[in-house]
Amino acid sequence: MFILTMGLNHHTAPIDIREKLVFKETEEEMALVTLQQEKSILENVIISTCNRTEIVAVVDQIHTGRYYLKRFMANWFQMDMEKIEPYLFFHEETEAVNHLYKVTAGLDSLVLGETQILGQVKHAFEIAKQTETTGTLLNKLFREVVTFAKKVHHHTKINENAVSVSYAAVEVAKKLYGSLDNKKIVLVGAGEMSELALQNLAGSGIADITIINRTKSNAELLANQFQAKVGAYENMNEHLMLADIVLVSTSATEPIIKQAAMQDLMEQKASSMLVIDIGLPRNVEHDCSYIPNFHLYDIDDLAGVVSANSLERQRIVLELENTIEVEVRNFFEWEKQLGVVPVIRALREKALDMQEVAMTSLENKLPGLTEREYIQIGKHMKSIINQMLKQPISELKEMSVEEDATTSIEHFKRIFGLSETDVTVIEKEQAETRS
C-alpha cells in the first residue's frame, strides 16, 4: 500500500483551468464511489475548494495508481488527459503526507495561515468516511492532520488578524477607494465566502449593503446578522446600477454576470464599479474586464494583496515545517506497526512471481507468439491479479485494527502461503527505503 496525492492548485494551474476541474458539492459522493471502483485505488478522499482540487488516495502500486487517478480526473471532467496533465502534481508517501499537513494548517494556501481550509479538509474527510471510501490508513491520517491543524491555529499566531480570500477582496476595495465610507456594496451570493466578506467589512464605514441570492431566505438570514438589505435576484442589474462595489460568490457552474448585459449597464452608469469575483467556477464573464470603468478582479488577482505576510508569520512557518516532519515520521512509524504493509507487499510479490513463471511457461509452449501478443497477455494477466487481490488487501487492512489483529494476520498469511521469510525481506527493504 502506498499513499499518493494528485491534484492541481493555485501554484500549478491558472484559474481558467482550475474552474473546469471543480467537483460539485452535489456530486462529491458519486465521484468518491466512482474513483474507488478504479483499479489500484484502495482508499480515497477528494478535496475541492476555490484554490485546489486534490485527491488523497491509498493505492496498491504507485505507477498504476498515478495512471488511474489521471484517468479518473480526465473521464470525470470529460477532458483529454494530455490537456490536464501539465497542470497536475503528484506527491508520494512522505511527500504526500507532508503536503496534506501543510494544506490543512493553511501553509499552502493563497492566504498564508487561513483557517477556512481546515474546515474544508475536515468536510472532505467526513464525506469520504460516510461514503465508505476511507479505511485504516486515511482514517488515521486525516484524524491526525485535522487535530494538528487545530492545535496550530490555537497555539500559534499564524492566523492572527485572520486573512482569507474574502479579506483580500475587502482590501482590494480599500486600496481602490481609500475610505469605504458611504460606498454602496452589493453581495451576490449568501454562502460562507459572502459571510466572511461581511465580517471583514464590519467597521469599514459601509452603511449600504445589499445581499442578492437566488434563494431569498438564505439572503434574508445573512442580512439579519449584519443589518443589510435584501435585493431580488431577478432585479440584480438594477442593484448593480447603483453599486460602487460588487462581491460575487455563488455556487453557479456558469457565469451569472454577462459581458453583454454589463456593457449596456456601464454605458448608462454614471460612475465606475469594482467587481470582485471570488467564485469558482468564475461567476463573472472574463470579457467584462474589457468594459470601461468595470474593474474586475478574480481569485488569482487577489494573490498580490495577501502575499506580503509578516516576518513573524514566516518564522512560524519554518517552525511548523520542522514540527510537521516529526508528525510525518510518527505516522509512518505507526503504519509500520500495523504489520500488514509487509504482508501486502509480500503477497503482491508472490503473485507477480507466479505470473512470471506462467509467462515463461506460456512462451515455451507457444513459441509462435509475437512480442505484441506476449506483452498483451502479460498485461491482462497482471490486471486479473490486481483485481483478485484488491478485496483481500482491503479486508486485511481492516483486520489489522481489530482486537485479534495478530491472529487474523497470521491466518491470512497461512491462507495465501506467505512465509515469515517472505515478509521479513519486505520489512528490511521498507526500513532501508525510509531510513
Curated annotation (Swiss-Prot):
Its EC number is 1.2.1.70. The record marks H99 as: Important for activity. GO terms for biological process: protoporphyrinogen IX biosynthetic process. It catalyses: (S)-4-amino-5-oxopentanoate + tRNA(Glu) + NADP(+) = L-glutamyl-tRNA(Glu) + NADPH + H(+). Pathway: Porphyrin-containing compound metabolism; protoporphyrin-IX biosynthesis; 5-aminolevulinate from L-glutamyl-tRNA(Glu): step 1/2. GO terms for molecular function: glutamyl-tRNA reductase activity; NADP binding. Gene3D superfamilies: Glutamyl-tRNA reductase, N-terminal domain (3.30.460.30), NAD(P)-binding Rossmann-like Domain (3.40.50.720). Pfam families: GlutR_dimer, GlutR_N, Shikimate_DH. Catalyzes the NADPH-dependent reduction of glutamyl-tRNA(Glu) to glutamate 1-semialdehyde (GSA). Possesses an unusual extended V-shaped dimeric structure with each monomer consisting of three distinct domains arranged along a curved 'spinal' alpha-helix. The N-terminal catalytic domain specifically recognizes the glutamate moiety of the substrate. The second domain is the NADPH-binding domain, and the third C-terminal domain is responsible for dimerization. During catalysis, the active site Cys acts as a nucleophile attacking the alpha-carbonyl group of tRNA-bound glutamate with the formation of a thioester intermediate between enzyme and glutamate, and the concomitant release of tRNA(Glu). The thioester intermediate is finally reduced by direct hydride transfer from NADPH, to form the product GSA. This is Glutamyl-tRNA reductase. It comes from Listeria monocytogenes serovar 1/2a (strain ATCC BAA-679 / EGD-e).
